[in-house]
From Swiss-Prot:
A single GO cellular-component term on record: cytoplasm
Residues holding GTP: 108-111, 158-166
SUPFAM superfamilies named among the record's database cross-references: P-loop containing nucleoside triphosphate hydrolases
Known role: One of several proteins that assist in the late maturation steps of the functional core of the 30S ribosomal subunit. Helps release RbfA from mature subunits. May play a role in the assembly of ribosomal proteins into the subunit. Circularly permuted GTPase that catalyzes slow GTP hydrolysis, GTPase activity is stimulated by the 30S ribosomal subunit.
Binding site for Zn(2+): 238, 243, 245, 252
InterPro entries cross-referenced by the UniProt entry: G_CP_dom, P-loop_NTPase, Ribosome_biogen_GTPase_RsgA, RsgA_GTPase_dom
Organism of this sequence: Mycoplasmoides gallisepticum (strain R(low / passage 15 / clone 2))
UniProt keyword annotation of Metal-binding present: yes
Protein name: Small ribosomal subunit biogenesis GTPase RsgA
Root EC class: hydrolase
Subcellular location: Cytoplasm
Domain CP-type G: from-to ranges: 58-215
Binding note for cofactor: Binds 1 zinc ion per subunit.
GO biological process, one term: ribosomal small subunit biogenesis
Length: 274
C-alpha cells in the first residue's frame, strides 16, 4: 500500500491511504537516521498498515516544506495590488533553483484599467524565455490552465488580494468540501493554522501553505545571478564563473542574449542587495 502525507503535526502523519484519511507514525529509528518527512511524501506500507519505506522524491521544496511537486502557479494582479515585477522575479528564481522547473504565471484583475502596451511587453518577454503565461480574463487561458493542473500536485503563490482564493474555487468548486473534511480531521491545536496541508484538487492535490511569504526568501546575489533556468544556461558562457551580469561585468554573455526587459528587472533586484 502507498500512503500520501497530507499534513504533519509533531509526530503525527495525517495521510491518505486508499482514499481514506489515516493517522500514521514514522518508525522510531527514522529520527536517529535523520529522515525528515514532508507533506506529499509517499510512503510504502506493509500489510499491517505500518510505514516501511519513504519512496524516493522527484523534487523537494525547503520552504514551504513539500515534496514531489508537479506545478507552481504564481498569481499576480495587474492592479490592486499593483504588479510588482521584482517580486515576481524573486519567486521565479526561488522555485526554479529549488525545483528545476519553471513556474506557471497567472495574471489577474485584467479588467481593471492598466497600460495594455506595457503589459503586452511583459507577457512577450516572459514567453520569449519559455514561461507559460495565463490571463484570467481570457476563457481559453483559463481552460488551458485547468487542463494543465488536472491530476497534478500544485502549489499556488501570491500576495493577499490578487484573487488566488477566487481562482481556486473557480478551478474546482468542490475544494471547500474537501478542505472542511481534512481540516476537521487534522484539528490538532493552534500550530496547524500555518502548517502546510494537501487538499484534493482537480483529481490531484493542492498544497496550501498559509505561512509562506516572499519576504522569507532571503535570496543571495549568487542565487539571483544563476537561479533562473534561462540564466543558468548562459552563466557557463560568461568569462567568470561568478559573473553577476551587471552593466560593467566583463565579457558577460548573458546580458547580450537575455530579453532586455527581463534583464532590467534582474538588475533592479540584484542592485537592491549588493
Amino acid at each position: 500500500m502507498i500512503a500520501r502525507i497530507l499534513s504533519i503535526n509533531a509526530n503525527d502523519l495525517f495521510c491518505e491511504v486508499n482514499h481514506e484519511l489515516k493517522k500514521l507514525h514514522a518508525p522510531g529509528r527514522w529520527k536517529h537516521q535523520k529522515i525528515n518527512l514532508a507533506p506529499n511524501d509517499l510512503l510504502e506500507l506493509n500489510d499491517q498498515g505500518e510505514i516501511i519505506k519513504l519512496i524516493e522524491r522527484k523534487n523537494y521544496l525547503n520552504r514551504p516544506k513539500v515534496a514531489n511537486l508537479d506545478h507552481v502557479v504564481l498569481v499576480f494582479s495587474i492592479k490592486d495590488p499593483q504588479l510588482n515585477l521584482k517580486q515576481l522575479f524573486k519567486f521565479m528564481v526561488y522555485f526554479e533553483s529549488q525545483l528545476g522547473f519553471k513556474p506557471l504565471i497567472v495574471f489577474s484583475k485584467l479588467d481593471l484599467d492598466h497600460d495594455q502596451n506595457e503589459f503586452k511587453k511583459i507577457v512577450e518577454a516572459l514567453e520569449q524565455i519559455n514561461y507559460q503565461v495565463f490571463k484570467l480574463n481570457e476563457p481559453d487561458d483559463f481552460l488551458r490552465l485547468k487542463n494543465l493542473l488536472f491530476n497534478k500536485v500544485t502549489i499556488f503563490c501570491g500576495h493577499s488580494g490578487v484573487g488566488k482564493s477566487t481562482l481556486l474555487k473557480r478551478l474546482d468548486n468542490s475544494l471547500d468540501i474537501w478542505t472542511q473534511a481534512v481540516s476537521a480531521k487534522l484539528k490538532r491545536g493552534k500550530n496547524t493554522t500555518t502548517a502546510t496541508k494537501l487538499y484534493k484538487f482537480l483529481d490531484g492535490y493542492l498544497v496550501d501553505s498559509p505561512g509562506f511569504s516572499i519576504y522569507d526568501l532571503n535570496l543571495t546575489k549568487q542565487q539571483l545571478s544563476c537561479g533562473l533556468i534561462e540564466f543558468a544556461q548562459y552563466q557557463t558562457k560568461c568569462k567568470f564563473n561568478d559573473c553577476l551580469h551587471l552593466e560593467n561585468s566583463a565579457d558577460c554573455y548573458l546580458k547580450k542574449k537575455i530579453n532586455s526587459l527581463i534583464y532590467q528587472i534582474y538588475l533592479s533586484v540584484i542592485k537592491s542587495i549588493i
